[in-house]
Design a protein with these regions (language model features):
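Divalent metal-cofactor coordination and adjacent catalytic microenvironments
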Residues: 1-161
Length: 161
């Protein structure tokens, strides 16, 4: 199924249980596990609300197909072939994108092919960030129906503390 999955989650949270204890004047008797769970759930809530990764993590984004370019309806007759044009980029969710690890495609026999990094570049000057094909390059063809392209990338503002 196409979607976004976490490959490697954050190694530590933005604040520690001791910081919370000190700020909220909580006794040492309260379990650290409870406080750590509250910190993690708070971070996840903020990330889901914002649609962003606050701390660096590795994500895998799988898609079923590359969208086609929207073309306006044509009135009258047109001379030339009727063809579809694929977009030259893939938008990546959960900004900010730090780096792309790899872009892979899968054919009907589930054979994995890694797209050479010289064939695309990361455009993270805009949001959402996107992978853009270089001039003269095309997306792989003869792909399977589901999860045809997989992008693994690092997203987030940096490590905790």
């Amino acid at each position: 199924m196409a979607g976004l999955t976490i490959v490697a989650d954050v190694s530590e949270e933005p604040i520690s249980a001791d910081n919370v204890r000190e700020y909220a004047h909580i006794d040492d008797g309260v379990e650290t596990t409870v406080i750590n769970n509250m910190i993690k759930s708070s971070r996840l809530y903020v990330e889901n609300y914002l649609g962003r990764s606050l701390l660096n993590r590795t994500l895998k984004y799988s898609i079923d197909y590359v969208d086609e370019v929207d073309q306006p309806l044509w009135e009258g007759t047109r001379i030339g072939p009727d063809m579809t044009i694929r977009r030259r980029y893939l938008q990546l969710p959960r900004p900010p994108v730090v780096s792309v690890t790899h872009v892979k495609s899968f054919d009907d026999a589930d054979t994995e092919t890694t797209l050479a990094s010289s064939k695309y570049y990361l455009d993270n000057q805009r949001e959402p960030a996107r992978i853009v094909l270089r001039n003269g390059e095309t997306w792989p063809t003869a792909l399977r129906v589901a999860n045809t392209i997989e992008v693994t990338y690092v997203s987030g503002y940096g490590a905790a503390r």
